[in-house]
Amino acid sequence: MLGVQKKRSTRKTAARKTVVRKPAAKKTAAKKAPVRKVAAKKTVARKTVAKKTVAARKPVAKKATAKKAPVRKVAAKKTVARKTVAKKTVAARKPVAKRVASTKKSSVAVKAGVCMKKHKHTAACGRVAASGVKVCASAAKRKTNPNRSRTAHSWRQQLMKLVAR
């Protein structure tokens, strides 16, 4: 009896299923616009009113006026006495001595007296070269260097300087 399982007892009458009732689908009634009842109008006896006779107006003859341009009034100019201003005495400028392009001297003689840069020399500007010749510190030799290539920018800068003078 060990190998045989006990058979479970089953109901002979089928268990009734509980039927869930679906709620009846509500029909959405089309809304009717509320109809206003118009009150019956009572006929009222009108009183006869004596009509006043109105004198017919004559149309006024319009005058065609030529449009005048608005005239501006010019304010009368008052003569104002001018104050005499004392003239300031300006110191007469001395004409700058122009350098005459001298005929080429020996290069040593030229270097000894004149720096290539055209400006006022300051203490910081000058340095004494080994030979004892005073040369401007800001690469005076650069201007005379034949290997130097000029850009369009440098040309422009030079032109601007010349114009400024």
Curated annotation (Swiss-Prot):
Residues 1-80 are annotated as: Disordered. Belongs to the histone H1/H5 family. HCT subfamily. Pfam families: HC2. Residues 1-50, 59-80 have a biased composition (Basic residues). Keywords: DNA-binding, Repeat. One of its GO terms (biological process) is chromosome condensation. This is Histone H1-like protein HC2. NCBIfam families: histone_lik_HC2. It comes from Chlamydia trachomatis. It comes from the Bacteria. The gene is hctB. One of its GO terms (molecular function) is structural constituent of chromatin. InterPro entries: HC2 (IPR009970). Might have a role in establishing the nucleoid structure of elementary bodies.
